[in-house]
Amino acid sequence: MGGLTTVCMPISANVVLGHGVKIFQPDLVNLYGCKVGDDTRIGAFVEVQKNASIGRRCKISSHTFICEGVTIDDDVFVGHGVMFTNDLFPRASVDGRLQTEADWKVVPTRVKRGASIGSGVVILAGVTIGEGAMIGAGAVVTHDVPDHHVAKGLPARLGRELSTTSTPSR
């Protein structure tokens, strides 16, 4: 019987890390071709792909997937197990054929300053989450969320407007 094989994914040399970045269990993350801002914290089992950007003073909790084309501004909280997508037609083209690299297109997604994303959220390609917005745990975000609003549910529906003083003032 074979033993357990452990493969550690190093942090790629083409990653730009700001000052004071804390990566918990760096042998259990996969970062390549991305930018991470000053004083950001990244948990275990996080993947951040090329051409993704995380701002300053963010917290990215464990088991989170941040794909190519995602921009996360400063002071954002991302809960455990959050998944971003970047392709409107995953696995198949519009006519149903399997995609190749030639017809795959990254659709940018943005999370604005001070937003908070609960655990288990799925954020579909092309969505903008507004400044100071809060996304409830387990939501599937299919449309933009305005600044300072709550969104929750499956699919996510807009809830109440938040006070503008709930956004960090950095």
Question: Across the structure, where does each feature detected by a protein language model lie?
Answer:
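Flexible, glycine/small-residue-enriched loop-and-beta-strand segment within the central core
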Residues: 2-16, 23-127, 154-155, 160-163, ...
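C-terminal/domain-terminus segments
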Residues: 127-144, 148-150
